[in-house]
């Protein structure tokens, strides 16, 4: 047990999200999202986007694997909602770039910078993704890139600028996004109400 635990710890990295201008959480909470349900729309829209990108790569011959079932699933747990896709997935480097750096640079710079860039492979994934923190104490991304030999990773963050990322086993490509412990729901709401 202990040896296994040690291995896990040694492959886990902690870091701070690169906050270059203002931290994006207050921006998101205040301006972008007055509507709680929007986070679910955002996460599903990210999942659909990742799926479309995989289809595109397959159609131009850049993805040669089995495309298979591309349904986006939303499943409810007691304290979680999981949005799962079998799209392009993310590598640790992409998480670092799109989640840790871009999404936390000022929202305005970010929107300015990417609004005309159709080629940003993961587009504005980060911004919509962070809307999940409006309702959850912690958010996890469990993902495996479509790239051959890619290592699956799990990223988690509790809404502070600190995150952890670790290597995990995941058989299939794609991404699960799991907002955990819904702190910000109104008293009478449960995950199911969303």
Can you name each region flagged by the protein language model?
Residues 1-7, 183-190:
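Conserved small/polar residues in nucleotide/adenosyl-binding loops
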Residues 6-182:
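GHKL (Bergerat-fold) ATPase N-terminal catalytic module, capturing the glycine-rich phosphate-binding loop
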């Amino acid at each position: 047990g202990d040896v296994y635990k040690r291995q896990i710890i040694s492959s886990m990295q902690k870091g701070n999200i690169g906050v270059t201008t203002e931290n994006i959480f207050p921006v998101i909470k205040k301006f972008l999202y007055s509507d709680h349900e929007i986070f679910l729309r955002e996460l599903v829209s990210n999942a659909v986007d990742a799926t479309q990108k995989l289809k595109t790569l397959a159609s131009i011959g850049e993805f040669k694997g089995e495309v298979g079932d591309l349904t986006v699933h939303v499943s409810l747990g007691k304290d979680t909602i999981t949005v799962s896709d079998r799209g392009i997935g993310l590598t640790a480097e992409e998480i670092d770039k799109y989640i840790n750096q871009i999404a936390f640079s000022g929202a305005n710079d970010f929107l300015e910078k990417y609004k005309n860039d159709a080629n940003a492979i993961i587009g504005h994934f980060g911004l919509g993704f962070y809307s999940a923190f409006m309702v959850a104490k912690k958010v996890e991304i469990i993902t495996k890139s479509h790239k051959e030999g890619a290592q699956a990773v799990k990223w988690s963050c509790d809404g502070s600028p600190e995150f952890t990322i670790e290597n995990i086993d995941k058989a299939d490509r794609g991404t699960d996004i799991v907002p955990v412990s819904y702190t910000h729901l109104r008293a009478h709401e449960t995950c199911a109400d969303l």
